[in-house]
């Protein structure tokens, strides 16, 4: 179990461009900041961009009794409003929202720093030297750092939080 989890952590932060890793997903997104606009974030799958107009139309046609609100499509004003609020959290709170507002690219530096955290590097170094390439251990070389289960848990937690942030706050998709 420990070998499998630690090898997985190493793979998730692999910077080799051919690897399917959280690091490379982040880098692919960071290379195309022009796609990270408010309009694409909010309305990419058919949600209304101008939720106020849809809300106003809904209130005019409202009847007495229990109603269900659309959560997808052009009538989902509430979902659209929440998407605007989520976008505000990653681009700042502009006094007037504009379709071409962009996500603050400084967020990528923060996420990269999380994926390069010393505890993750400690786990990766241990895996490289004791699991993946144990035959290369130099008996006269420096001691191999040993990661504890707490280190592994913290490393995995950091990676999961970065992936969750990418999934929800950058790609506007539900997390895992």
Residue map of PLM features:
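Histidine-centered, metal-coordinating catalytic motifs and their short helical/loop contexts
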Residues: 115-140
């Amino acid at each position: 179990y420990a070998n499998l989890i630690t090898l997985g952590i190493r793979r998730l932060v692999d910077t080799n461009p051919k690897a399917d890793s959280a690091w490379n997903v982040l880098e692919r997104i960071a290379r195309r900041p022009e796609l990270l606009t408010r309009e694409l974030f909010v309305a990419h799958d058919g949600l209304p961009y101008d939720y106020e107009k849809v809300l106003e139309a809904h209130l005019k046609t409202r009847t007495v009794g229990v109603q269900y609100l659309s959560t997808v499509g052009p009538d989902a004003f509430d979902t659209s409003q929440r998407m605007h609020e989520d976008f505000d959290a990653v681009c700042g709170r502009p006094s007037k929202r504009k379709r071409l507002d962009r996500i603050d690219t400084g967020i990528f530096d923060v996420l990269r720093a999380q994926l390069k955290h010393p505890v993750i590097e400690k786990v990766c170094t241990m895996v490289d030297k004791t699991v993946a390439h144990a035959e290369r251990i130099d008996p006269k070389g420096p001691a191999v750092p040993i990661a504890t289960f707490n280190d592994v848990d913290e490393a995995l937690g950091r990676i999961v939080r970065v992936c969750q942030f990418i999934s929800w706050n950058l790609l506007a998709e539900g997390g895992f």
